[in-house]
Amino acid sequence: MRGTDKQQSGMFSELSPEERVPEKHPLRAIRGMTDEVLKGLWAKFNELYSITGRPSIAPEKLLRALLLQILYTVRSERLLMEQLQYNLLFRWFVGLNMDEPVWVATVFSKNRDRLLEGEIARLFFAGVLEQARSADLLSDEHFSVDGTLMEAWAGQKSFQRKDGSEKPPPDEAGNPTVDFHGEKRSNETHESTTDADARLARKSGGHEAKLAYCGNVLIENRNGLVVDAELLQANGTAERDAALLMAERMEGSQRVTVAADKGYDTQELVREMRGMNVTPHVAQNDHRRGGSAMDGRTTRQPGYKVSQVKRKRIEEVFGWLKTVGMLPKTRPGGVHTVGWVFTFAAAAYHLVRMRNLLYMPVQSV
């Protein structure tokens, strides 16, 4: 018997959002790990908020929503609020009831800015990392480091002289034509009027220079999990500076290895890392003036060759951050804000990897 095409929707439902989400849905495991981290941030949240006044958006719900925005590549807060209106899965993950109103996008953004003022992203990342350590997913001996350029949300037309020298009036007020030919532009004489912290940089000689930041991650070599993240202004030494910063923050007193590409093959970096009880497994740059800083004491070891293979897994992290994690371009706001988003996106990647390692069924051959 053919069913009727009824258009009248029911007024009531006896099923909760919890019951509608499949037991094996990937977000179930991710939400469980996220909630565990948020419990540990309760005291820190109390420090950020006043005990009087109107209640804000709960920081726990705010962070869950921001996590969804990264995991599902929702390009703006306005679209995220739209999704929360009708997407049952999103409502369940954030913790909204079926009839609970969704926040106005501008209110959501204002509340998000409060979290940007604190080190919440760094603390959230540390909480996720501690779960991975408790599950014995992290190597405490072998690591890899690398950096990549994160294109800033600023156009070339915004890169103007710092001295404000006179320029001819624009031919079109909204989108003026700008001719850069014959003009020498550098970070010493110019800066972006859109994002003053962005720097003109290029990854290598064959690429065009863009306004960008330098995003750096340190991964452990067992499962390719991110153990530290650092975003700096893009300059000639940003990758090496970040590598030393992250090496200095590493826990434990035992000697460890850190693999890196040829760009890190300098006498200064190798010397400073060895002084931190770190054995650098840096790819040799024999074309460098003075030769490679790496000698046979390190390169003849079997572990050195293994590190050179393992370090390439770091590209998986950058690939995810620049596609799923919405970081092919950063958002305006300066190095602090962009660094906050970069660290939080690295934590999101970490949650996805942990879910795959801990909860994915093993395929039998």
Across the structure, where does each feature detected by a protein language model lie?
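Short, well-ordered loop/turn and helix-capping segments at boundaries between secondary-structure elements
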Residues: 71, 86, 90, 219, ...
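Short acidic (Asp/Glu) and glycine-rich catalytic loops that position anionic groups and cofactors
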Residues: 8-13, 41-45, 106-108, 194, ...
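Helix-centered, glycine/charged polyanion-binding patches within enzymatic domains
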Residues: 164-168, 178, 185, 262-336, ...
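Polybasic low-complexity intrinsically disordered regions
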Residues: 82-85, 94-276, 285, 355
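Basic, low-complexity intrinsically disordered segments
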Residues: 2-5, 9-11, 15, 30-137, ...
